[in-house]
Amino acid sequence: EMKYIASWSGGKDSTASIILAHEHHEPLDLIIFSEVMFDKGISGELPEHIDFIQNKAIPIFESWGYKTKILRSDKTYMDCFYHVVQKSEKNKGKRQGFPRPNMCKINDRCKTEVLERFHKGLKTGEYQKYIGIAKDEPARLSRIKTSDDSQISLLQKYGYTNQKSAE
């Protein structure tokens, strides 16, 4: 049986996608959010953002009958900060330290990796993933069309631009 999963960042586009699924009676079995942790006990998300996620949006989604799941990586911001570089000859043995512009590994190691692991646990062809990409983002839309047939943008399907998502 096909499962329908919304990949939710808590931003305007992915939130609008869930609202559209609800308003248009699209099937939705699970909403997943990947929380970056500062350390094992403290969220790395902005306090206002994680408050919105946990205390405003999730209760509404659950009142609509949707199951939500917060995923967390085993790796935290602090793990990345104190990571000892192994591969680079120039920096081998040094600590990673503060994320560098355009070279930040935090999102990759603490957010994306746990989402990819979650999806790998599902069988191809058994799930459809809703993602929040607006119709006026052609470059991003073209990447999903070429990379993964299991992804669909409800914003594109219903003609939502970035501006309309914000409303």
Q: Residues of each region from the PLM?
A:
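Nucleotide-activated chemistry modules centered on ATP-dependent adenylation/adenylyltransferase
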Residues: E1-E167
